[in-house]
Amino acid sequence: MLGLVLLYVGAVLFLNAVWLLGKISGREVAVINFLVGVLSACVAFYLIFSAAAGQGSLKAGALTLLFAFTYLWVAANQFLEVDGKGLGWFCLFVSLTACTVAIESFAGASGPFGLWNAVNWTVWALLWFCFFLLLGLSRSIQKPVAYLTLASAIFTAWLPGLLLLGQVLKA
């Protein structure tokens, strides 16, 4: 399931970057954010509530919900026409959570996938922190955040998702 989720996280991050660069409208980007938010939430609920759920899948589901809720909130903001400050502060919470996951991942990393996972969580922590600065504190960093979002889309989600789905990369 990781490959599936990462492929669509790559898509949503790519389109969010294009939106941040002013190339598409907020209402257009809401569609992919809603779709990926719902998809991620469904995967998270499966991981949490399936008959085979254990501590590992509970944790994976809880962390996946951080992504799902972020995308659903981005989608909602496009229709609520709010300034995004609440989402920005949520991004700070998620960034701090992602930092702890990154540290834990580096400490327990074994093999290429473990290292890749730790680096991903580090990049995601940085990305969410940048969204806190952009939205929560209204910093004028939209263009650099757009490019970081684009790089994150490609290297932490889209390409790894494709590699996992093609069974070139093993989780």
From Swiss-Prot:
Compartments, record wording: Cell membrane
UniProt KW keywords: Cell membrane, Membrane, Transmembrane, Transmembrane helix, Transport
InterPro entries from the UniProt entry: AmiSUreI_transpt, AmiSUreI_transpt_sf
Gene3D superfamilies for the chain: 1.25.40.600
Domain of life assignment: Bacteria
Disulfide bonds: none
Main location: membrane
GO CC list: plasma membrane
Transmembrane segments: 1-21, 29-49, 60-80, 87-107, 118-138, 145-165
Statement: the UniProt record of this protein carries the keyword Membrane: yes
Topology within the bilayer: Multi-pass membrane protein
Free-text function comment from the UniProt entry: Possible transporter that might be responsible for the adsorption of amidase substrates or release of their hydrolysis products. AmiB and AmiS may act jointly in to a two component ABC transporter system.
Similarity comment: family membership: Belongs to the AmiS/UreI family.
The name this protein goes by in its record: Putative transporter protein AmiS
